[in-house]
Amino acid sequence: MAASTTLALSHPKTLAAAAAAAPKAPTAPAAVSFPVSHAACAPLAARRRAVTAMVAAPPAVGAAMPSLDFDTSVFNKEKVSLAGHEEYIVRGGRNLFPLLPEAFKGIKQIGVIGWGSQGPAQAQNLRDSLAEAKSDIVVKIGLRKGSKSFDEARAAGFTEESGTLGDIWETVSGSDLVLLLISDAAQADNYEKIFSHMKPNSILGLSHGFLLGHLQSAGLDFPKNISVIAVCPKGMGPSVRRLYVQGKEINGAGINSSFAVHQDVDGRATDVALGWSVALGSPFTFATTLEQEYKSDIFGERGILLGAVHGIVEALFRRYTEQGMDEEMAYKNTVEGITGIISKTISKKGMLEVYNSLTEEGKKEFNKAYSASFYPCMDILYECYEDVASGSEIRSVVLAGRRFYEKEGLPAFPMGNIDQTRMWKVGEKVRSTRPENDLGPLHPFTAGVYVALMMAQIEVLRKKGHSYSEIINESVIESVDSLNPFMHARGVAFMVDNCSTTARLGSRKWAPRFDYILTQQAFVTVDKDAPINQDLISNFMSDPVHGAIEVCAELRPTVDISVPANADFVRPELRQSS
């Protein structure tokens, strides 16, 4: 992208204007004139041609990738090249903790509102990092009166007596930086009261752009007398804390984070956001916008991060057992392989190494699975992205949160279990006899389906104009380094239900869609012995994303996350061992 189209993070309107002024990418073929999400009335062949045109085009076709530059007076900014696109990052490390008081200049209290997935991790990491920096900034937890989370916060060392635990509204009013980490649905229902309690010139910190999407859908915006920033760890809260603790002796390890400055009233926002990210232990921090973040994040959770991987292992397990495979072997060839050897290989060496590790016969089976699965996966992913971007999925989350309680004479409908079927009971048995450090088998068909899903998600985000750092973190790194290890440890619910309410809802909603489309379209194509789409295989082999992943791999956490079955850093209701 030309230098003249570099975009300022603090001015979203400037971003939109610059994007409009940027050189236009070549026009996509007319076949993509209808979105997949509304293509039910179009013939299947036409839908396939539309998606084929989308994939066959060079990666540059589609929305232009923004060049998100930023200025910092505290930390060192580095330029990296990802697939030919220049981006800027800040490396983390405990050696940077002495810079935190300068980054947080003018802040006396950081209020952490909520104690769900991210709250406990971020509060403890911030407290510990600031203590190491010998800062007198107070990290205070704010909870609603009567919350059961008070006991959990006290157990983590936050107390009323020390002024580090208290009422939500007192905490919001008394904080210079308010980290709003309650559920997205709760944010949507309470934002007006939260805004009214914030001090002028204070800073609102978000770890998800959901609230912006909700406000946009209502034609609203944030108050103009506060700064609005985001630091969004690319992993669940328990991973953020676990890797921070594991990395204490080796200059830090944690979860990569994106950051955004949506509104800056006094020029401090960028350094505060970067300080927040460094204090969380982020190995590297990359820039995004609040809008790009919520679109990629909500979409990613429903895709390969949670929902789609759940859907494909259910579909594959059923396929293998119907073909006569032993149940335990079927579980090993699906869940164990994806969360073990496949994730480990992608994390350290990339997707191509998964393919190159196969025998010649295995590569043929991989190609069949990849060729048959890519377009069906993209079909659902494309629909999901547009549901998020249009606000439909955001509205769905808000309404679902309200159904958790009795209303209008109807009963409450909280989230139900997702690990009570035969497959997941078999998984308990497999894990009970699994040798230590066993990574499961590399099944070529499973690998082909999983990698096809990953590449389809990468392609949708790329065509929608997301930066490579965001694409790779939301489609690859978060999946293999943060989330899959939890499913490997104790099954799908242990992975999904340690995440946010928005992620848990989305995973439950979209997982069946991936299961269905793979069963009805991809596997049927394989069973018919349909020709392999050699263009798809060739595009996979030569895709520039592989080089970008190599660069990101050099910035990965310095340790691998360890998730024991009896982990005590997860949600309280999930702490009992299987």
From Swiss-Prot:
Binding site for Mg(2+) 2: D297, E474, E478
Binding residues for NADP(+): 111-118, 144-149, 183-187
Main localization of the protein described in the UniProt heading: plastid
Targeting presequence: 1-52
Protein residues bound to Mg(2+) 1: D297, E301
Gene3D superfamilies in UniProt: N-(1-d-carboxylethyl)-l-norvaline Dehydrogenase, domain 2, NAD(P)-binding Rossmann-like Domain
Subunit-structure text: Homodimer.
Family the entry assigns: Belongs to the ketol-acid reductoisomerase family.
Protein name: Ketol-acid reductoisomerase, chloroplastic
